[in-house]
Structures are given as structure tokens and as C-alpha cells.
């Protein structure tokens, strides 16, 4: 029995190891500087796949950082957060892809810590092109958190590894309420093509 368990465990390890992939890194080049982000396809495959589709197909062309959420500009929210939000801004934008499966932090284990990148959404399963980056730890955005009344949290899928100073510059840029004035242009989002294609070709979600 013990040998059988060891054999079974070995098979499980081999199967799971065959389906792991190196974490790709993308660079968000903005007017304020560059932000490097490591993505976690092994933990959040649907969300990373979606984001990299936008990158590989140049669907983020014309994207901006347009929203800054600070402690002093959310007077009507009992649960306050600090993030910057970017993307195409329009859910009906011609470059937008269909909404994706909502991967909760309970599923992925990726918490909303300082520098975490995550998907903006309305209802669960409506995220598409809009994303945000956390300034400081934001546990209220995790599964079970109270920022969104449905308690499903937001789909985190990576973390800033270089350029948090740029994130903070954007966060403190001039704004009217939560809306950056002017918006901060995203000049390009790119990564090593072989890394991106490895995810897109070998990690296509089935859900």
C-alpha cells in the first residue's frame, strides 16, 4: 500500500510539473516611466492568458491610466483602498475581448499586496480590459473582503517587481475626484515574445 501511495504521488507530481510554466514579465511603458510586472500563469491561468492576449495582439494601443483612488477622494466608501486603474476605459471598445472567468484569490492564493496587479470588474465574470495596481496592502479586495458587496473580491494575477516609484507618481498625479486630469498615457505594454507565446500556445484556458 505504501509503495502504491508513493507511486501515485510520483505520477501526480509528474503530471502537475508538466503543466507549470515560467512566470513571464511584462513592462508597462508610461509617460511617467516604466513598470515591470511578473505574471503568475500557474496560479491565475485564465486572467494571465487574457492579459497576454491584449499584449500580444496590441489591444492595449491607446490605453491609459485614468483613475487614482486615494484615501482623500473616496468619501462615500466605508472601506477605503489605494490603487491606480488603467486600460481601454470603455467596455465596448472595439479592441476589447469578451469578459473572462473570475479567478478569486481563494482559488489562486494571490493576495492584494503592495504592487499587486488585478482586474477591475462590476459583477463577477465581467472583467475584460481594465486593471489596477495596489499601493500598499489591500486585503479588502481579496475574496471575502468588503470593498465589493458580493464578497467575491477581485482577480489578482501578478505583482510589480520594478517601478513602484512610477506607480506612486501616477497615484499622486493631478486629479478631479478619482479621475486623472490629464490621463497618463500607456505608451506600450510588452514582454519577451517567447515567454508570452509559451503561455498563449500552451496554457489556453478550457473554461
Residue spans of the language-model regions?
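Cyclophilin-like peptidyl-prolyl cis-trans isomerases
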Residues: 17-207
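Sec-dependent N-terminal signal peptides
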Residues: 4-16
Amino acid at each position: 500500500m505504501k509503495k502504491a501511495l508513493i507511486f501515485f504521488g510520483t505520477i501526480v507530481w509528474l503530471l502537475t510539473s508538466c503543466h507549470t510554466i515560467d512566470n513571464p514579465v511584462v513592462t508597462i511603458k508610461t509617460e511617467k516611466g516604466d513598470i515591470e510586472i511578473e505574471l503568475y500563469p500557474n496560479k491565475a491561468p485564465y486572467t494571465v492568458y487574457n492579459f497576454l492576449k491584449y499584449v500580444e495582439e496590441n489591444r492595449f494601443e491607446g490605453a491609459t491610466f485614468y483613475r487614482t483612488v486615494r484615501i482623500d477622494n473616496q468619501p462615500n466608501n466605508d472601506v477605503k483602498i489605494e490603487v491606480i486603474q488603467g486600460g481601454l476605459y470603455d467596455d465596448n471598445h472595439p479592441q476589447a475581448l469578451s469578459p473572462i472567468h473570475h479567478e478569486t484569490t481563494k482559488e489562486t492564493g494571490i493576495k492584494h499586496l503592495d504592487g499587486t496587479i488585478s482586474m477591475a470588474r462590476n459583477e463577477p465574470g465581467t472583467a475584460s480590459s481594465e486593471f489596477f495596481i495596489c499601493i500598499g496592502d489591500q486585503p479588502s479586495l481579496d475574496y471575502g473582503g468588503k470593498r465589493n458587496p458580493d464578497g467575491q473580491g477581485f482577480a489578482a494575477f501578478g505583482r510589480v517587481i520594478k517601478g513602484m516609484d512610477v506607480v506612486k507618481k501616477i497615484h499622486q498625479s493631478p486629479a478631479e475626484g478619482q479621475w486623472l486630469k490629464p490621463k497618463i498615457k500607456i505608451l506600450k505594454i510588452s514582454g519577451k515574445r517567447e515567454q508570452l507565446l509559451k503561455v498563449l500556445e500552451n496554457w489556453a484556458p478550457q473554461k
